[in-house]
């Protein structure tokens, strides 16, 4: 086993919290150099390279100590020293020990890497697929060309649609190849197979017209074109020598400035409050503009839009459109990015596209079976679908991997209220407040509502005072108004009605049903309930489980 080289020649940097680890062996904290011995440096690099995955003790011993005669005690001492170098304490754990498995770096890490030299270019012509529906053929042709054009920085040059769109006969193909001389071309034929389709793909090297690969791909009904594009991209990697897009590289940010903006945006996203999500939206949008070829900001931005919709502070329909756009962009940069696939899985299942969503979640989990992100998205998906027991189990798995994830803790609190009742919810809320969510206004507003439902009005009023007025919007406002109704009954109704009148698109927000029921009565609430049910409203599935709406079921 070769020795780990502690000073590789690279301009890559790892950034976490206020640390910067350079690949020249130096560690900086707030721009001041921190002494780190070679062995500790080597272990830290391996943990950071693993990007949150578990690294076994044997792997660390083999790569850092090589063939030297050492035992696990040497590694234990090294980890202990590394924790001291990083000033680790109980509140800020950087390195997690998983007994019997190994170690894992437990904090957000961003890799900064300057752009790599441009690779050799391979020109590709994508011919229109033979299909019964001409309009559908043109649409699919455009989508595939657009999708594969994203790989231009990695050596793939795709001829534009305007040149290839009329290339359908053998004569047209031969003329195009003779005039423009691309290196390769792709042709395809779509054959109906029940409700689905079989796409027969051929990849041909133009020199000698040599067939490199032939494959049949099954397309499920309503499956997005980006998934077919991803499969074709994988085939190109296998068939074209020298064509390599490093998916790890395109997930990295290209400057310290963009890294710092991303980390600030990610921090605000993780705080999971109305104000912090609005700040995250600004920062992550800025980061996408600074690093348009990096995956992480697109994924974070997609999650931000979904979170704002869930919290009732962004128009739900527009949020879903924006989230899907950014998740698709991330998959165009790396078709095997687990977080992006998980986000698309969540978005598709929210839209009742269960088969596609299930396939995406399955692929994401296979690529990254121990991911707090994937566990959270899947648990959120199960919660929205009403599978409360399975949702609770999955969210618990997420919190085991990342106990500080505010959004997962709050999702668990809603699930507990729906599944096992208000007493368990109050106990869990107190537990979460004593751990990582003591000041979170969403959690506080939920506790105020739960306590008010139980008749503990004085305690609820005391807790209300801890919520900042700038955070009282969306779901927080709804929770506090419902608590006010529990405390003051009829006297609270004018305020609730005024709030409902001020809300835009009330007919598209099932989260307002508890207030509508108490303010306007069962008949109007039932009318809204049936409207959401008949429209198959994507957010109704989540709210119809609320115990406060039991009269309407």
Curated annotation (Swiss-Prot):
It comes from the Bacteria. One of its GO terms (biological process) is regulation of DNA-templated transcription. This is Transcriptional regulator HilA. Residues 11-107 bind DNA. TPR repeats lie at residues 372-405. Keywords: Activator, DNA-binding, Phosphoprotein, TPR repeat, Transcription, Transcription regulation, Two-component regulatory system, Virulence. The lineage of its organism: Bacteria, Pseudomonadati, Pseudomonadota, Gammaproteobacteria, Enterobacterales. Induction: Expressed in response to both environmental conditions and genetic regulatory factors. Transcription is subject to complex control and is stimulated by the SPI1-encoded HilC and HilD. Coiled coil: none annotated. The keyword Lipid metabolism does not apply. The modification 4-aspartylphosphate is found at residue 62. One of its GO terms (cellular component) is cytosol. The keyword Transcription applies. PROSITE patterns: OMPR_PHOB, TPR, TPR_REGION. Disruption phenotype: Abnormal expression of genes encoding virulence proteins. Does not affect the production of reactive oxygen species (ROS) in infected pigs. The main transcriptional regulator of the Salmonella pathogenicity island 1 (SPI1) gene expression. Activates the expression of invasion genes by a direct action at their promoters and also indirectly by increasing the level of InvF. Also binds upstream of prgH and directly activates the expression of prgHIJK operon. One of its GO terms (molecular function) is transcription cis-regulatory region binding. It comes from Salmonella typhimurium (strain LT2 / SGSC1412 / ATCC 700720).
